[in-house]
C-alpha cells in the first residue's frame, strides 16, 4: 500500500513560485513517488537516491530535486531546490 505524502509549507511555497512547465513536472513526480518508492526495479525516471538514514532525494524536474524522509506512515517532502541548494542543505543539516 502506498504511503501518504506530506509536504512542508516552504516546499509548497517554492512549488507555487515555479513556472507552469516546471510546476507540472514536479507535481507529476510527486504523484508517482508513493507508488515507485521501494520498488527499485521499476524505472520511473524519478532518480530516487539515498542521501542518509531515511533521507532521500528524487527528481522533480530537469533542474529541481525534492528531498524527502521515509517515515513509517508517510513520505515527508521537506525541501525543493536545485542540486547546489540540496548540497548546501545537506552540508548544513537543515532538513527536518
Q: Which residues make up each language-model segment?
A:
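Intrinsically disordered, low-complexity, repeat-rich regions
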Residues: 27, 38-39, 93-96
